[in-house]
């Protein structure tokens, strides 16, 4: 499978989606189902890191599938961080946010590296702890 899904930390607050090489819509759909299976037994909110630092161009139709995945996310989803420096992926993300999810610009962000993704989420989690 060109998309691997796993917990990124032992606290089970971050899911890591690792996109490798060329991947297909069917693999994206399977990964989304796997995320739902992982999160069905937890009672807290999660972040998702989409690690696209080592993948090729997204398949045709990904915006529609990403929209479906976003609509299915539910209450447990706190936000997503896309790790990539691929200009095409960044442009598609911008199109997705403008067309399907303009109100969620703060919930979906892009960074260049996995380190930046984890740093951003850690900062967001600290903010949540401070406000509760």
Predicted feature descriptions by range:
Residues 1-132:
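Amphipathic, Lys/Arg-enriched alpha-helical "gate/interface" segment within cytosolic domains
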